[in-house]
Design a protein with these regions (language model features):
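Helical substrate-recognition/capping region of FAD-dependent monooxygenase/halogenase enzymes
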Residues: 2-7, 11, 26-27, 83-85, ...
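Core beta-strand elements of the Rossmann-like FAD/NAD(P) dinucleotide-binding domain
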Residues: 4-6, 145-154
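N-terminal Rossmann-fold NAD(P) dinucleotide-binding loop
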Residues: 17-18
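Glycine-rich FAD pyrophosphate-binding loop
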Residues: 25-46
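Active-site-adjacent segment of FAD-dependent monooxygenases/related oxidoreductases
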Residues: 42-117, 213-214
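A conserved short coil-to-beta-strand element within the FAD-binding core of flavoproteins
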Residues: 123-137
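Conserved FAD-binding catalytic core of PHBH/FMO-like flavoproteins
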Residues: 154, 158-279, 288
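FAD-binding beta-loop-beta segment adjacent to the flavin cofactor pocket
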Residues: 281-298, 302-304, 412-433
């Protein structure tokens, strides 16, 4: 059976796939999301988000929805790198934001938001085949009532590290697998072992802080979520083995004894669960050799996998989703300039490379041996230096990569500062609708010059002493496409170039070209470039 054409099919209803769906639906595009699981999974995975993605959630009104607070996000004053503290108190424009939330709850909330926006998520429907065409793809699906085919213009693979979409698209996944075994479980810890600030005091070892701890015989991880449920994990290096037999709590106890040198008196957690109890044999660090194959795109773990140390996964994957989402929507809606979709892989690939670099570095610094111990002492000294801490904050937050947007202004290519205008409006609130914003701080001159794009770009006039610019053009993903400190004739020309580069030609030019020859927005852009 073949169904009616749908503009976009998304394979995978995890955080990344659902975020793409929400971005499309905000722009009036209704995707179909396919998920092989019959319902959202309660399996414990990530425990929160860090970095730029927290601010992007704020730009959609989701941060407030997720936290139940009207307050904007605040940066963390400390983070970790391979278990070593990175003090961030003195970092200017600190980009390290954090939102602690279990991944199952995140998926439920994003699914709820997607349904509100009109997204159809088909739980229990698995993508099994793809036949590519010049204008899209035919997607084979296996569902509860049998098999069927969806015709689509675009296909997004958000189906994890073993991505079916990636394999069917013929996209290679090169990388490295390390010889480590990680074991993780939710447990109950005796009250007398609970240390200050969320740490644990292990008899015979002493206090160990919250998070990753490197010891002579491996790594020990501790995180307390609630009184009757803590997460305990171990990392052992150069240990061969397989991942065939189910993980047991006794296996974790044995591993903890090898790492700590003492028994760890933990018991199963109370409550219905589900509770984490898993083993990860080998740590994969891999990146797809390309994020796009024709009309097929990869986001999140489908495009890259890496160590979870430092928590970069959702920051990387959900930013992929927001970057791709608005560009796909612009293309489906007919106003995307030529080459807009090509900027998705060109912008996001290098960000993935940076995450793999620092996650592999953290894993290496967690390894055994006196040489690594000496190297960690050196790193600990360096991390106390303000300039090093600032560099690490931007690396871990993902704000060290600047997109090439065709402008050399210091703000261009970076996430927009969340300033508050004199009338109380925050820049993040202006982006709740997922549309581009032209912020006019010139008294009206900037906005007047861009009236031809008012059907696609929200014009916002205001004043603030917190920005020394007369205007900024902000993409839907929150990145600055153009900014100017003054607004002379050359600045107006550069604004028009930026508007056309990211949001197509003006309404008048598009209408005239279509009357003359029925051209698409991309064709109009090519003729007027």
């Amino acid at each position: 059976m073949s169904e009616t054409q749908v503009p976009v099919v998304i394979s995978g209803a995890g955080p990344n796939g659902l975020m793409v769906a929400c971005e499309l639906a905000l722009a009036g595009v209704r995707p179909v999301v396919l998920e092989r699981l019959p319902a959202p999974s309660d399996e414990p995975k990530a425990n929160g988000m860090v970095g730029q993605v927290v601010r992007q959630l704020d730009m959609r009104g989701l941060y407030q929805r997720f936290t139940g607070s009207d307050d904007p996000p605040q940066p963390a004053y400390q983070w970790i790198f391979s278990g070593m503290s990175v003090p961030l108190f003195g970092v200017p424009d600190n980009p390290m934001y954090a939102l602690m939330m279990a991944q199952p709850r995140l998926v439920r909330l994003l699914d709820e938001r997607a349904r509100e926006l009109g997204v159809e998520t088909r739980w229990g429907h698995e993508l099994t085949g793809v036949q590519t065409r010049s204008d899209g793809a035919a997607v084979d699906v296996s569902g509860p009532d049998g098999t069927y085919t969806l015709e689509t213009t675009y296909l997004v693979g958000a189906d994890g590290g073993r991505s079916t979409v990636r394999k069917l698209a013929g996209i290679d996944f090169p990388g490295h697998t390390s010889n480590t075994i990680a074991r993780i479980a939710h447990v109950r810890v005796p009250d007398e072992m609970r240390g200050p600030n969320g740490g644990i005091d292990v008899p015979g070892v002493g206090p160990l802080p919250f998070g990753h701890n490197r010891l002579d015989n491996g790594g020990f991880i501790y995180a307390e979520f609630e009184r009757e449920r803590s997460m305990v994990g171990t990392i052992e290096f150069d240990e061969p083995g397989d991942d065939l037999e189910p993980m047991t709590l006794d296996e974790l106890r044995d591993s903890a004894r090898r790492v700590l040198g003492v028994d760890l008196p933990v018991e199963p957690p109370l409550g219905p669960g589900p509770h984490a109890l898993r083993r990860i044999a080998g740590q994969n660090t891999r990146q797809a050799d390309r994020y796009r194959a024709g009309n097929i795109f990869l986001v999140g773990d489908s495009a890259h996998v890496h160590s979870a140390m430092g928590g970069p996964g959702l920051n990387l994957g959900m930013q992929d989703a927001v970057n791709l989402g608005w560009k796909l929507a612009a293309t489906v809606n007919g106003w995307a300039p030529a080459g807009l979709l090509d900027t998705y892989p060109s912008e996001r690939y290098s960000v993935g490379e940076r995450v793999m670099m620092h996650s592999m570095s953290q894993t290496a610094l967690f390894g055994p041996g006196p040489e690594i111990a000496a190297l960690r002492k050196l790193f600990n000294e360096l991390l106390q230096q303000p300039s090093v801490a600032e560099h690490m904050a931007h690396l871990l937050a993902g704000s060290d990569v600047r997109y090439d947007v065709g402008s050399d202004h210091p703000l261009a290519g970076r996430l927009v500062p969340d300033v508050t205008l004199d009338d109380g409006r925050r820049v993040a609130e202006m982006l709740h609708g997922g549309r581009p914003v032209l912020l006019d701080l010139s008294g009206g001159h900037v906005g007047d010059a861009a009236r031809g794009w008012a059907d696609r770009v929200d014009m916002v006039a205001g004043a603030t002493a917190d920005l020394e610019v007369c205007g900024m053009l902000i993409r839907p993903d929150g990145y600055v496409a153009w900014a100017a400190d003054s607004f002379e004739a050359d600045d107006e020309n550069r604004l028009h170039v930026a508007l056309q580069r990211w949001f197509g030609v003006s309404r008048a030019e598009r209408g005239a070209a279509r009357r003359d020859g029925g051209l698409s927005s991309a064709q109009v852009a090519e003729r007027t470039a």
